[in-house]
Amino acid sequence: MQLSSLAAALGLPARADLAGVEITGVTHNSSWVEPGALFVALRGANTDGHTYLPQALQRGAVAVMGEGLPDGVACPVPYLTVPHGREALADAAAELAGHPSRGMGVVGVTGTDGKTTTAWMTRHLLRAVGVPTGFLSTVGYELPDGELRQFPAHFTTPEAPQVQQFLAELRAAGAQAVVLE
């Protein structure tokens, strides 16, 4: 996807330096950057993702997105300034994945106790009435045909790019609904 198209989809103003830049993926983790990636520098309680900008660029990031470059930090690739980095990460991931949840029924289960039971029961009920349903939990995901897949070991809770990737896989496997724990 062209960076200019992604920026437009995110509601960002058009800029000449975005033309011709091809984005092949998005991540907030500099060690997961692959050539062609958009690196999203998130600010956290203990660290600022901009600290990892050199590593992301070395690994092949072709653009960076964040809530603003810190003073004294240079960025030799296009930098997209957004008001909310984590929200922009989610929106960019959905856009790059083709918004896989559109057209699917999506059930989210949150809370302290009973999430897994509630999510599995919901999945079972949807399948019982003939709705091909995928399932996404904190340990893995299940395709509509019942095939279980575990997340790679480095995931504890999948972030937006991984969730969108899994949703795209579920949709490609025929899911008409998904239950997210």
Predicted regions and their residues:
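N-terminal leader/targeting and accessory segments in enzymes
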Residues: 1-91, 95
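Phosphate-binding loop of NTP-binding sites
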Residues: 88-180
